[in-house]
Amino acid sequence: MSLVCSLSCVAPLPQTKQSRPSFLKLETCTLSLSSPAGYPNFTTGIRKHISYLFTEPIKLPRLAKSRILVSQESFTETSTIDMDWEDQEEIEDTGSPWEGSVMYRRNASVTHVEYCTTLERLGLGRLSTDVSKKRASAMGLRVTKDVKDYPDGTPVQVSVDVIRKKKKLRLDGIVRTVITLGCNRCGESTGESIFSNFSLLLTEEPVEEPDVIDLGFTFGNDKEEGEDDDDNDDSWIDWEDKLHFPPEVKEIDISKHIRDLVHLEITITAICDSACKGMCLKCGANLNKRKCDCGREEKDKGYGPLGNLREQMQQKEGLRN
């Protein structure tokens, strides 16, 4: 087997003040790969023959003067633009809108905490509509008086159990809310109830990303041992859910994790009702609200584009006669 590649290119050379622009031309580049018989893979026993042929630097003719007229005012000091990077950084660093919506405060005498916020406060206002608000009201979810930013938003209730360990705090909780999604059948807005569990581990020591990520699969005898120590071992918690919580700090923001949980519940398989009839694929009518006549149309009994071929041929023969 042999492979021959030929190319020709021009490469610039360093230019001095007293010399014109020079270029180095690469005439040919031939690469031959041969494989002896008996080797199924040509990469085994390859003999390489590479030859390069260079020529002397080629001096190009002097370039003609450009006829483009450049105004001298373009290079004046008054035309320069001053960039104030400090002001720009202050404008860009506006923070996240969901920061501070759910704050855990250290308290040694409290083992259960209840929080209430809204989808709008978490930066998920596009998932909040009248449909989600009515569904949440039917579930018994209400916006408390502590939420002053969006009192009419869709409520998000968070229940947290606090488990204290040596230099650690584990927060096991559940998030309850309703988000607005599009029905997969008819396309109308529908409310999707959310009951999502989460666990956070607050440690006094800084959290570092592990070199080896454990997927949580155990085999053989290790599986039984892992089940016995499941309640006392926090290794199953993802390192992204482990937060640094120094002892001198009194509160920590967990709003981002709550927001991520709601994001994970967004699905494209939401259905407004199990008896939803969907929409007509031809005219787009919502079959839950009205009926269409697309199904009553008579189907073509011919043979596709050749169904009327006989009639067309008879008409042509009649015209000829």
Curated annotation (Swiss-Prot):
Compartments, as annotated in UniProt: Plastid, Chloroplast stroma, Chloroplast nucleoid
Q: A GO term (biological process) for this protein?
A: ribosome biogenesis
Coiled coil residues, start to end: none
Q: Which UniProt keywords apply?
A: Chloroplast, Plastid, Ribosome biogenesis, Transit peptide
Q: Which GO terms describe its cellular component?
A: chloroplast; chloroplast nucleoid
Q: What happens when the gene is disrupted?
A: Embryo lethal.
Task: Identify the Pfam families for this entry.
Answer: YceD (PF02620)
Q: Where is the transit peptide?
A: 1-32
Predominantly, its location class is plastid
Its family remark reads:
Belongs to the DUF177 domain family.
Function (record text): Plays a role in synthesis, processing and/or stability of 23S rRNA. Required for embryogenesis.
| Protein's UniProt name | Large ribosomal RNA subunit accumulation protein YCED homolog 1, chloroplastic
Its source organism is Arabidopsis thaliana (Mouse-ear cress)
What are the top taxonomic ranks of the organism? Eukaryota, Viridiplantae, Streptophyta, Embryophyta, Tracheophyta
